[in-house]
Design a protein with these regions (language model features):
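Structural motif
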Residues: 12-15, 30, 99
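Outer-membrane beta-barrel translocator domains and adjoining extracellular loop/strand segments
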Residues: 121-126, 169
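C-terminal/domain-edge helix-coil "capping" segments
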Residues: 20-36, 101-102, 114-117, 132-205
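Sec-dependent bacterial lipoprotein signal peptides
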Residues: 1-20
Length: 205
């Protein structure tokens, strides 16, 4: 019995030793340096207002925080980006044209989908528009496309559900127009962007 206890203690000590051993800092899963300057198209979204532009800026900040020195050229909305190269859709020719015109090696683009907006207060059916606090479900997806080949070299997605403020419902569609986005829906966006951009950060193993 005593020998069994000693064996158990010894095994526990070995596990504890390895668990508390030094961790190794590994490079990001996605290294952006080979692409030189990146282009970034503002997120498309089914939500009106400033949520998509706000989230796009948070993605930009997260990328440059993870890999300082990364150059990013903001190409505006999808409509503006297509118009700048005389294209009607974001196909290979449009991607290639952005690479030639702006000298970007890759373009980051994505979509922010808002679903199941559930107001936390009652809304009178006679009102067409009312500002509310609401629980929303959001799905953020993004990808990095190489301009030379048109191939997608990275993609990721994140999903979250939070109670956010300053949401308007117009015809049943969500509108986000907070004067202070950080306070109104910063927590939701921080969660989504943090998970989405994790591949750009160094990590311990």
């Amino acid at each position: 019995m005593r020998s069994m206890k000693l064996s158990a203690l010894l095994m526990g000590g070995i596990i504890l030793f390895w668990g508390c051993g030094p961790k190794i800092l590994l490079p990001p899963r996605v290294d952006l340096r080979p692409y030189g300057t990146l282009g970034m198209i503002e997120l498309s979204s089914n939500a009106q207002g400033n949520l998509a532009p706000y989230t796009s800026q948070k993605i930009l900040h997260s990328i440059q925080d993870a890999q300082p020195g990364t150059l990013v050229m903001e190409l505006g909305t999808l409509q503006n980006a297509l118009g700048s190269v005389g294209r009607s859709e974001l196909d290979y020719e449009a991607i290639k044209a952005h690479g030639s015109k702006y000298g970007v090696g890759g373009i980051i683009m994505g979509n922010l989908e808002i679903d199941k907006v559930k107001p936390s207060i009652n809304i009178a059916s006679t009102l067409a528009t009312i500002n509310v606090s609401a629980y929303v479900e959001a799905f953020l997806s993004a990808k990095l496309v190489e301009t030379k080949s048109g191939a997608t070299v990275w993609s990721n997605g994140a999903q979250g559900r939070e109670n956010v403020a300053s949401v308007s419902l117009m015809g049943g569609e969500p509108v986000f127009n907070a004067t202070d986005p950080d306070k109104a829906y910063g927590q939701l966006v921080q969660h989504l962007v943090g998970y989405l951009c994790n591949d750009f950060r160094s990590y311990y193993k």
